[in-house]
UniProtKB/Swiss-Prot annotation:
Coiled coil stretches, renumbered: none
Gene this protein is translated from: htpX
Entry GO terms, CC: plasma membrane
Cofactor(s) in the UniProt record: Zn(2+)
Name of the protein described by the UniProt record: Protease HtpX
Keyword Transcription regulation part of the UniProt annotation: no
GO BP terms: proteolysis
Cofactor remark: Binds 1 zinc ion per subunit.
Protease recorded as keyword: yes
Principal location listed in the UniProt entry: membrane
Places the protein is found: Cell inner membrane
TM annotation in the entry: 5-25, 35-55, 155-175, 194-214
Binding-site residues for Zn(2+), renumbered to this chain: 140, 144, 219
């Protein structure tokens, strides 16, 4: 859902930089583990949950998505009716439904909780997919909301942020001590802050791999959920349509994680599994 690259990454990166500055100003260092852990958790989880709370606003602003309040045509009436039916079947509150301009076949879901979500589709999806295929895509996004993927991603990102902040400073302190020996006064030199910055980038790379692994895992679950809501054959047909029409996404990178676009990145950094793997998983499933 909410959830790269991922919707949180840009904000979380900024928070990591801010955390580095604040901790340096406050003199927090690896020898003060309790203080370090508290500060790391505040900044680590703070960035994720700020992103989560602002996710709908950020998504609307960055994509130009227009929420349907009063349907203007049959397509919008169908969208609202389909989402309402699927939301009821999934046991969640009715999400806001929006349409954004974009030639790609794509959709995303975001929001702070299961009962306060946003589901948006591109005009490219509406123009290039049949109603059955679009219904499956909507089911996929509703499944993201029903599965609680947004809050789970926020929690995971918070843990990863905290891990990066703490480990970078602990390892940075060890390396700095080894390089400089026992510095008089026990203070940290300029090299320490350079080392910490570099380590945050390196550990952040590994953290991204973990979050991308979770993102791929949740896509399989959302596909299964979409198949349950709309039908397995419709879900397979929607993914096959994507294979035929996979163009370059115009979604911002922080939103694309919640869409259903392909990726040219290496698999470890892909937010979505390859389409052929998703189709194979659906064919092997027992969902009707």
């Amino acid at each position: 859902m909410l959830t790269r690259i991922a919707l949180f990454l840009a904000t979380n990166f900024a928070v990591l930089i801010l955390a580095s500055i604040v901790m340096s100003l406050l003199g927090v260092n690896p020898s003060q583990m309790s203080g370090l852990l508290v500060m790391a958790a505040i900044f680590g989880f703070g960035g994720s949950f700020i992103s989560l709370l602002l996710s709908k606003w950020m998504a609307k602003r960055s994509t130009g998505a227009v929420v349907i309040t009063e349907p203007r045509n049959q397509t919008e009436r169908w969208l609202l009716a389909t989402v309402e039916r699927q939301a009821k079947a999934a046991g969640i509150g009715m999400p806001e439904v929006a349409v954004y301009e974009g030639p790609e076949i794509n959709a995303f879901a975001t929001g702070a909780n299961r009962n306060n979500a946003l589901v948006a589709v591109s005009t490219g999806l509406l123009h290039n997919m049949s109603e059955d295929e679009a219904e499956a895509v909507l089911g996929h996004e509703i499944a993201h909301v029903a599965n609680g993927d947004m809050i789970t991603m926020a929690l995971l990102q918070g843990v990863l942020n905290t891990f990066v902040i703490v480990l970078a400073r602990v390892v940075g302190g060890i390396i700095d001590s080894a390089l400089s020996g026992n510095r008089e006064g026990g203070g940290r030199g300029f090299a320490y802050y350079i080392i910490v910055f570099v380590l945050e980038m390196v550990f952040g790379l590994f953290a991204t791999m973990i979050s991308m692994w979770f993102s791929r895992h949740r896509e399989f679950r959302a596909d299964a959920g979409g198949a349950s809501l709309a039908g397995r054959q419709k879900m397979i047909a929607a993914l096959e349509r994507l294979q035929l029409n996979h163009g370059q996404s115009t979604l911002p990178t922080q939103i694309a994680a919640f869409g259903i676009a392909g990726s040219t990145a290496k698999k470890l950094f892909m937010s979505h599994p390859p389409l052929e793997e998703r189709i194979a998983a659906l064919r092997a499933s027992t969902v009707a």
